[in-house]
Protein backbone atom coordinates (compact mmCIF):
# COMPACT_ATOMS: atom_id res chain seq x y z
CA UNK A 1 0.00 0.00 0.00
CA UNK A 2 1.52 3.31 -1.12
CA UNK A 3 0.31 6.78 -0.10
CA UNK A 4 0.38 9.21 -3.02
CA UNK A 5 2.24 12.37 -2.02
CA UNK A 6 0.02 14.59 -4.19
CA UNK A 7 -2.92 14.23 -1.81
CA UNK A 8 -3.52 13.32 1.82
CA UNK A 9 -5.29 10.02 2.39
CA UNK A 10 -4.96 8.63 -1.15
CA UNK A 11 -3.44 5.17 -1.51
CA UNK A 12 -2.69 2.69 -4.30
CA UNK A 13 -1.78 -0.99 -4.26
CA UNK A 14 0.87 -0.74 -6.96
CA UNK A 15 3.30 -2.51 -4.62
CA UNK A 16 1.18 -5.70 -4.71
CA UNK A 17 2.27 -7.97 -7.58
CA UNK A 18 -0.90 -10.06 -7.28
CA UNK A 19 -3.24 -7.06 -7.50
CA UNK A 20 -1.21 -5.71 -10.43
CA UNK A 21 -1.51 -9.07 -12.21
CA UNK A 22 -5.31 -8.99 -11.87
CA UNK A 23 -5.34 -5.39 -13.11
CA UNK A 24 -3.28 -6.41 -16.15
CA UNK A 25 -5.90 -9.03 -17.00
CA UNK A 26 -8.69 -6.45 -16.65
CA UNK A 27 -6.89 -4.00 -18.93
CA UNK A 28 -6.52 -6.60 -21.70
CA UNK A 29 -9.12 -5.88 -24.41
CA UNK A 30 -9.33 -9.63 -25.12
CA UNK A 31 -10.53 -10.51 -21.60
CA UNK A 32 -14.16 -11.67 -21.88
CA UNK A 33 -17.02 -10.65 -19.57
CA UNK A 34 -16.83 -13.77 -17.40
CA UNK A 35 -13.13 -13.36 -16.65
CA UNK A 36 -13.57 -9.60 -16.25
CA UNK A 37 -16.23 -10.10 -13.59
CA UNK A 38 -14.08 -12.69 -11.83
CA UNK A 39 -11.21 -10.22 -11.82
CA UNK A 40 -13.34 -7.51 -10.21
CA UNK A 41 -14.50 -9.96 -7.53
CA UNK A 42 -10.88 -10.88 -6.79
CA UNK A 43 -9.87 -7.23 -6.56
CA UNK A 44 -12.75 -6.50 -4.20
CA UNK A 45 -11.67 -9.35 -1.97
CA UNK A 46 -7.95 -8.61 -1.91
CA UNK A 47 -8.28 -4.84 -1.64
CA UNK A 48 -10.76 -5.43 1.17
CA UNK A 49 -8.12 -7.58 2.87
CA UNK A 50 -5.62 -4.72 2.48
CA UNK A 51 -8.13 -2.30 4.02
CA UNK A 52 -8.27 -4.37 7.21
CA UNK A 53 -4.62 -3.41 7.80
CA UNK A 54 -5.81 0.18 8.36
CA UNK A 55 -8.56 -0.77 10.83
CA UNK A 56 -8.63 -0.74 14.61
CA UNK A 57 -7.85 -4.04 16.31
CA UNK A 58 -8.44 -5.28 19.84
CA UNK A 59 -6.44 -7.86 21.78
CA UNK A 60 -8.49 -10.77 23.13
CA UNK A 61 -7.94 -13.97 25.05
CA UNK A 62 -8.77 -17.21 23.26
CA UNK A 63 -8.91 -20.81 24.49
CA UNK A 64 -7.25 -23.33 22.21
CA UNK A 65 -7.85 -27.07 22.84
CA UNK A 66 -4.59 -26.99 24.82
CA UNK A 67 -4.30 -23.64 26.62
CA UNK A 68 -5.23 -19.97 26.71
CA UNK A 69 -3.41 -17.59 24.37
CA UNK A 70 -3.68 -14.06 23.05
CA UNK A 71 -5.27 -13.12 19.74
CA UNK A 72 -6.87 -10.12 18.06
CA UNK A 73 -10.12 -9.11 16.42
CA UNK A 74 -10.45 -6.40 13.79
CA UNK A 75 -13.12 -4.30 15.50
CA UNK A 76 -13.97 -2.10 12.52
CA UNK A 77 -14.59 -5.13 10.29
CA UNK A 78 -17.88 -5.69 12.10
CA UNK A 79 -19.12 -2.13 11.52
CA UNK A 80 -18.96 -1.66 7.77
CA UNK A 81 -21.45 -0.20 5.31
CA UNK A 82 -20.72 -0.90 1.64
CA UNK A 83 -22.29 1.51 -0.86
CA UNK A 84 -22.46 -0.03 -4.33
CA UNK A 85 -22.63 2.27 -7.34
CA UNK A 86 -24.56 0.39 -10.04
CA UNK A 87 -23.78 -1.45 -12.14
CA UNK A 88 -20.04 -1.86 -12.47
CA UNK A 89 -19.43 -2.09 -8.71
CA UNK A 90 -21.55 -5.22 -8.19
CA UNK A 91 -18.60 -7.64 -8.62
CA UNK A 92 -16.41 -5.42 -6.42
CA UNK A 93 -19.06 -5.57 -3.68
CA UNK A 94 -19.20 -9.36 -4.03
CA UNK A 95 -15.50 -9.52 -3.25
CA UNK A 96 -15.72 -7.03 -0.39
CA UNK A 97 -18.53 -9.02 1.25
CA UNK A 98 -16.19 -12.02 1.49
CA UNK A 99 -14.00 -9.94 3.83
CA UNK A 100 -16.69 -7.84 5.52
CA UNK A 101 -19.38 -10.49 5.89
CA UNK A 102 -21.26 -8.48 8.54
CA UNK A 103 -21.55 -5.42 6.27
CA UNK A 104 -24.79 -3.63 5.62
CA UNK A 105 -25.19 -2.72 1.96
CA UNK A 106 -26.52 0.37 0.22
CA UNK A 107 -27.33 0.64 -3.48
CA UNK A 108 -27.08 3.80 -5.60
CA UNK A 109 -27.88 4.05 -9.29
CA UNK A 110 -25.93 6.95 -10.76
CA UNK A 111 -25.28 7.59 -14.46
CA UNK A 112 -22.79 10.13 -15.78
CA UNK A 113 -23.83 12.10 -18.85
CA UNK A 114 -21.65 13.02 -21.79
CA UNK A 115 -18.94 15.67 -22.01
CA UNK A 116 -18.52 18.51 -21.38
CA UNK A 117 -21.18 18.81 -18.65
CA UNK A 118 -20.89 15.24 -17.25
CA UNK A 119 -24.30 15.71 -15.63
CA UNK A 120 -25.14 13.02 -13.07
CA UNK A 121 -28.54 11.34 -13.01
CA UNK A 122 -29.38 9.52 -9.78
CA UNK A 123 -32.68 7.67 -9.87
CA UNK A 124 -32.38 4.96 -7.19
CA UNK A 125 -30.99 5.30 -3.67
CA UNK A 126 -31.31 2.69 -0.90
CA UNK A 127 -28.89 3.33 1.96
CA UNK A 128 -29.10 1.96 5.54
CA UNK A 129 -28.66 4.12 8.63
CA UNK A 130 -25.02 5.07 9.12
CA UNK A 131 -23.76 5.04 12.71
CA UNK A 132 -20.82 6.89 14.35
CA UNK A 133 -18.83 3.64 14.72
CA UNK A 134 -19.25 2.67 11.04
CA UNK A 135 -16.71 2.59 8.25
CA UNK A 136 -18.44 3.43 4.97
CA UNK A 137 -16.87 1.96 1.82
CA UNK A 138 -18.16 3.46 -1.43
CA UNK A 139 -17.28 1.00 -4.19
CA UNK A 140 -16.95 2.21 -7.79
CA UNK A 141 -14.36 0.68 -10.15
CA UNK A 142 -13.53 3.82 -12.11
CA UNK A 143 -12.80 7.20 -10.52
CA UNK A 144 -12.68 9.30 -13.68
CA UNK A 145 -14.01 12.86 -13.49
CA UNK A 146 -15.11 12.37 -9.88
CA UNK A 147 -18.55 13.78 -10.71
CA UNK A 148 -20.42 10.56 -9.93
CA UNK A 149 -18.67 9.94 -6.65
CA UNK A 150 -18.99 13.50 -5.32
CA UNK A 151 -22.72 13.26 -5.99
CA UNK A 152 -22.92 9.85 -4.29
CA UNK A 153 -20.84 11.01 -1.31
CA UNK A 154 -23.14 13.99 -0.87
CA UNK A 155 -26.11 11.63 -0.80
CA UNK A 156 -24.44 9.26 1.67
CA UNK A 157 -23.87 12.12 4.15
CA UNK A 158 -27.64 12.46 4.57
CA UNK A 159 -27.77 9.04 6.29
CA UNK A 160 -25.36 9.75 9.14
CA UNK A 161 -21.78 10.63 10.08
CA UNK A 162 -19.50 7.57 10.11
CA UNK A 163 -16.14 6.99 11.75
CA UNK A 164 -14.49 6.79 8.31
CA UNK A 165 -15.55 7.17 4.70
CA UNK A 166 -13.53 5.29 2.09
CA UNK A 167 -13.79 5.32 -1.69
CA UNK A 168 -12.56 2.02 -3.13
CA UNK A 169 -11.85 1.74 -6.86
CA UNK A 170 -9.81 -0.12 -9.42
CA UNK A 171 -8.43 2.83 -11.38
CA UNK A 172 -8.43 6.57 -10.78
CA UNK A 173 -7.48 9.63 -12.79
CA UNK A 174 -5.75 12.52 -11.01
CA UNK A 175 -8.58 14.83 -12.08
CA UNK A 176 -11.18 12.71 -10.30
CA UNK A 177 -9.15 12.37 -7.13
CA UNK A 178 -8.60 16.14 -6.98
CA UNK A 179 -12.32 16.80 -7.38
CA UNK A 180 -13.27 14.40 -4.60
CA UNK A 181 -10.61 15.69 -2.21
CA UNK A 182 -11.57 19.32 -2.89
CA UNK A 183 -15.18 18.66 -1.88
CA UNK A 184 -14.63 15.90 0.70
CA UNK A 185 -11.10 16.36 2.12
CA UNK A 186 -11.59 13.78 4.89
CA UNK A 187 -12.60 10.98 2.51
CA UNK A 188 -9.89 8.35 2.05
CA UNK A 189 -9.32 6.89 -1.42
CA UNK A 190 -7.89 3.42 -2.10
CA UNK A 191 -7.35 2.20 -5.67
CA UNK A 192 -5.33 -0.49 -7.39
CA UNK A 193 -3.56 2.13 -9.50
CA UNK A 194 -3.67 5.84 -10.35
CA UNK A 195 -3.57 6.22 -14.12
CA UNK A 196 -2.18 9.06 -16.24
CA UNK A 197 -5.12 11.28 -17.25
CA UNK A 198 -8.59 11.62 -18.76
CA UNK A 199 -9.33 11.91 -22.46
CA UNK A 200 -11.76 14.50 -23.89
CA UNK A 201 -14.69 12.13 -23.30
CA UNK A 202 -13.86 11.66 -19.64
CA UNK A 203 -12.37 8.16 -19.98
CA UNK A 204 -9.31 7.15 -17.96
CA UNK A 205 -6.08 6.63 -19.93
CA UNK A 206 -4.67 4.04 -20.34
CA UNK A 207 -7.63 2.69 -18.38
CA UNK A 208 -9.55 -0.49 -19.12
CA UNK A 209 -12.59 0.77 -21.03
CA UNK A 210 -16.15 0.91 -19.69
CA UNK A 211 -16.10 -1.37 -16.64
CA UNK A 212 -19.87 -1.87 -16.61
CA UNK A 213 -20.07 -2.83 -20.27
CA UNK A 214 -17.07 -5.12 -20.03
CA UNK A 215 -18.43 -6.89 -16.96
CA UNK A 216 -22.05 -7.26 -18.04
CA UNK A 217 -22.18 -6.61 -21.79
CA UNK A 218 -23.00 -3.46 -23.69
CA UNK A 219 -26.66 -2.46 -23.16
CA UNK A 220 -28.91 -2.51 -26.20
CA UNK A 221 -30.44 0.80 -27.20
CA UNK A 222 -34.08 0.30 -28.07
CA UNK A 223 -33.73 2.60 -31.07
CA UNK A 224 -31.48 -0.04 -32.67
CA UNK A 225 -34.15 -2.75 -32.57
CA UNK A 226 -35.73 -3.65 -35.92
CA UNK A 227 -39.22 -2.26 -36.35
CA UNK A 228 -42.05 -4.78 -36.40
CA UNK A 229 -44.87 -4.09 -38.84
CA UNK A 230 -48.23 -5.47 -37.78
CA UNK A 231 -50.65 -6.70 -40.45
CA UNK A 232 -54.28 -6.00 -39.64
From Swiss-Prot:
GO terms for molecular function: GTP binding; magnesium ion binding; uracil phosphoribosyltransferase activity. 5-phospho-alpha-D-ribose 1-diphosphate binds at residues 87, 112, 140-148, 210. The keyword Chaperone does not apply. Disulfide bonds: none annotated. Gene3D superfamilies: 3.40.50.2020. Its EC number is 2.4.2.9. Pathway: Pyrimidine metabolism; UMP biosynthesis via salvage pathway; UMP from uracil: step 1/1. Binds 1 Mg(2+) ion per subunit. The magnesium is bound as Mg-PRPP. GO terms for biological process: UMP salvage; uracil salvage. Its cofactor is Mg(2+). GTP binds at residues 38-42. Pfam families: UPRTase. Uracil binds at residues 204, 209-211. InterPro entries: PRibTrfase_dom, PRTase-like, Upp_A, UPRTase/APRTase, Ura_phspho_trans. Allosterically activated by GTP. Belongs to the UPRTase family. Catalyzes the conversion of uracil and 5-phospho-alpha-D-ribose 1-diphosphate (PRPP) to UMP and diphosphate. This is Uracil phosphoribosyltransferase. It comes from Pyrococcus abyssi (strain GE5 / Orsay). The lineage of its organism: Archaea, Methanobacteriati, Methanobacteriota, Thermococci, Thermococcales. The gene is upp.
Amino acid sequence: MIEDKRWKGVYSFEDSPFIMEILTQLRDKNTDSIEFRKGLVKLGRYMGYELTKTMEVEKVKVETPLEETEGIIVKDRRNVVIITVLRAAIPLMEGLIKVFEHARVGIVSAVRGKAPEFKIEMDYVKIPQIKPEDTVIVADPMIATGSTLTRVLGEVKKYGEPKRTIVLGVLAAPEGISKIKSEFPDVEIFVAKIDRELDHKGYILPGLGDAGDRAFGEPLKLSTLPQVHHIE
